[in-house]
């Protein structure tokens, strides 16, 4: 496959590392200690920040996947993408041995 039709989803662990999430977690814990937050409050802050980043990555991956399908099959933004299009774009049937 050439670069125009390649689909490589973002890896959440790599994105979190690039964003310095462990350092951010440390800063949140230090903030919690300094401001007498409960462990639950600190955990909620950490979870909220991680969930926000996971949501962003999931949306970017979904958008990239849709763009890949449209490019691969020559569909416009106005075309409706069906399950058959998804199967065709990712060649799922071929990988499952369902085609000749």
Swiss-Prot record:
Give the record's GO CC terms. Answer: host cell cytoplasm
Organism, as annotated? Escherichia phage Mu
Which family is it part of?
Belongs to the mulikevirus gp14 protein family.
The record's subcellular locations are: Host cytoplasm
Induction annotation: Expressed in the early phase of the viral replicative cycle. Expression of early genes is repressed by viral Repc (latency) and favored by viral Ner protein.
What does the UniProt keyword field contain? Early protein, Host cytoplasm
Q: Which superkingdom, per the lineage?
A: Viruses
Q: What is this protein's name?
A: Uncharacterized protein gp14
Tell me, in one coarse class, where this protein mainly resides. host cell
Origin organism lineage: Viruses, Duplodnaviria, Heunggongvirae, Uroviricota, Caudoviricetes
């Amino acid at each position: 496959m050439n670069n125009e039709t390649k689909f490589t989803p973002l890896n959440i662990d790599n994105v979190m590392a690039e964003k310095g999430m462990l350092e951010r977690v440390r800063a949140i814990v230090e903030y919690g200690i300094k401001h007498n937050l409960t462990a639950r409050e600190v955990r909620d802050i950490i979870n909220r920040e991680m969930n926000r980043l996971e949501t962003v990555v999931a949306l970017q991956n979904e958008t990239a996947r849709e763009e890949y399908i449209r490019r691969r099959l020559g569909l416009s933004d106005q075309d409706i993408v069906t399950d058959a299009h998804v199967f065709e774009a990712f060649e799922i049937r071929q990988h499952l041995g369902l085609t000749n």
